[in-house]
């Protein structure tokens, strides 16, 4: 009976198995697997993942080998009279002790890595990360620098009017900038609903929960640009909340902090400036495109029942 079933299975599913096998062979290995990170911790997480993966593969090979051998060797045709026995104490002890030792082998390195991940004390730089629908706010606590980071992908790309760029939906108008080789601590929270701040290259994924602060940290030695995203469904534009971190040398970081402080001074001066009507329109348009268009739409019509229309609104007209 078993071989009849196997024969039927082989004929009906051979093509599917061949297609699946060919897709796996031709696929990039790292497209199907966890990728290496850019920090010591993220590389430890990768090595831990691969260790447990190969342990699971070995267990699977042993278990399925025994199972298929038993199905082949102990058929009714070969053994018309079944063996009768109740227990085997040596075997029971073996299959209790061996899994216990395997779990210990996985738990020890995992615990060591977890201890390092949660050692978030005494950061050289502390950055408060606040999730909003649908953007991030970053505040550098020591330097009194604060800004919002919004998706900057062109709307024409989103609506398929032009070809999509290399970093489609992974571009922002303001990047997080941190210095290389310094311990940076992130204090992660939210203003409205639950978000999740995820940077795979740093092995960081922390929920941003209103009223709570979760912490994470990193030390990145290699300058470059690293990208992540919100990974907690947070509403209509959940997919439009990218995270971009730029790692630079200390001197460049100091220059960036200075420039942000100068921007804050200029912004404060604008509060006392006398604006012309044309300047107000231009300024309002730029602010609307950054902060309002995601909810109230380019036309100002909003979304019925969710975000009210601004076009023709008495509040706007007044």
Q: Where in the sequence are the language-model features?
A:
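Non-transmembrane, membrane-proximal soluble domains of secreted or membrane proteins
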Residues: 27-51, 71-283
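Hydrophobic alpha-helical membrane-embedded or membrane-associated segments
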Residues: 11, 15, 51, 60-64, ...
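N-terminal secretory/membrane targeting signals
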Residues: 1-28
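Alpha-helical transmembrane segments
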Residues: 60-74
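Gly/Gly-Pro-rich "capping" loops immediately C-terminal to redox-active cysteine motifs
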Residues: 219, 242-249, 302-318
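Active-site-proximal cofactor/substrate-binding loop regions of enzyme domains
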Residues: 56
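Cys/His/Pro-rich metal-binding microdomains
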Residues: 231, 293, 308
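Sequence/structural segment immediately N-terminal to covalent heme-attachment motifs in c-type
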Residues: 277-303, 312-318
């Amino acid at each position: 009976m078993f071989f009849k079933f196997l024969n039927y299975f082989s004929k009906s599913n051979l093509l599917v198995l061949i297609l699946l096998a060919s897709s796996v062979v031709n696929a990039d290995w790292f497209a199907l697997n966890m990728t290496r990170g850019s920090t010591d911790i993220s590389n430890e997480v990768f090595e831990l993942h691969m260790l447990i993966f190969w342990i699971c593969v070995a267990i699977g090979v042993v278990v399925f080998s025994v199972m298929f051998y038993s199905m082949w060797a102990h058929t009714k045709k070969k053994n018309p009279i079944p063996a009768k026995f109740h227990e085997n104490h040596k075997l029971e002890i073996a299959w209790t002790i061996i899994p216990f030792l395997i779990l210990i082998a996985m738990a020890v390195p995992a615990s060591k890595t977890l201890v390092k991940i949660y050692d978030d004390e005494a950061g050289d730089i502390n950055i408060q990360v606040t999730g909003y629908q649908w953007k991030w706010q970053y505040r550098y606590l020591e330097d009194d620098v604060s800004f919002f980071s919004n998706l900057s992908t062109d709307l024409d790309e989103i609506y398929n009017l032009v070809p999509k760029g290399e970093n489609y939906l992974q571009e922002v108008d303001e990047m997080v900038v941190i210095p290389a080789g310094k311990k940076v601590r992130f204090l992660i929270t939210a203003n409205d609903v639950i978000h999740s701040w995820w940077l795979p290259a740093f092995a960081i994924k922390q929920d941003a929960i209103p009223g709570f602060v979760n912490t994470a940290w990193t030390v990145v030695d290699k300058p470059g640009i690293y990208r992540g995203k919100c990974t907690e469904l947070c509403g209509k534009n959940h997919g439009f909340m990218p995270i971009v971190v730029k790692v630079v040398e200390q001197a460049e970081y100091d220059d960036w902090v200075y420039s942000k402080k100068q921007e804050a001074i200029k912004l404060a001066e604008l509060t006392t400036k006398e604006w012309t009507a044309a300047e107000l329109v231009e300024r309002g348009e730029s602010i609307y495109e950054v902060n309002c268009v995601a909810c109230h739409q380019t036309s100002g019509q909003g979304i019925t029942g969710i975000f009210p229309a601004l076009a023709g609104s008495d509040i706007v007209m007044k």
